[in-house]
Amino acid sequence: YQPTGWERVDRALEEMKLRLDTADNEEKFQAIGMIGRETLITIAQQVFDSEKHPTLDGVEASKTDAKRMLEAYLKIELAENSKKVIKFAKSAVDLANQLTHDRGATKRDASICLISVTAVASLIKSIQLTGK
């Protein structure tokens, strides 16, 4: 994993890794999901510009609507190649949300969440750096 340079994102990903190493119960695994969810929101906030990235459904994205912000960003930045990447990013949001609310959360679930959030962070940073 290459740090994104987004301090809050990098700090949160590191925190997720540290917590995963020591987590030993459902509540601790759920907390990793919560950090993952917040990290995805932060990533979306780093790149989303409502003036440049109109939402696909015309509904204004709230400051915490990671799915809508990422979808709008990716649709503009990747154009016709965006469909599968949007699906991937939205799936990462779903995984983090699911883990946050899963009262039977496991270490495997938390690990999958960490991997997906890390992948989205790297993906979005790469898109931002490479431009069109």
Predicted ranges, named:
Residues Y1-F29, K132:
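Charged alpha-helical initiation segments
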Residues Q2, Q30, Q45-Q46, Q98, ...:
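Residue-identity detector for glutamine
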Residues R8-E15, I35, T42, F88-L95, ...:
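Amphipathic, well-ordered alpha-helical segments in soluble domains
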Residues R8-R11, R19, R37, R68, ...:
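Arginine residue identity/basic-tract feature
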Residues R19-A23, E38, T42-H53:
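Short hydrophobic alpha-helical module
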Residues E26, D49-S50, T106, I127:
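Generic macromolecular interface patches on structured domains
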Residues E27-G33, Q45-K63:
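Short acidic alpha-helical/loop segments enriched in Asp/Glu that coordinate divalent cations
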Residues G58-G131:
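Long, charged low-complexity segments
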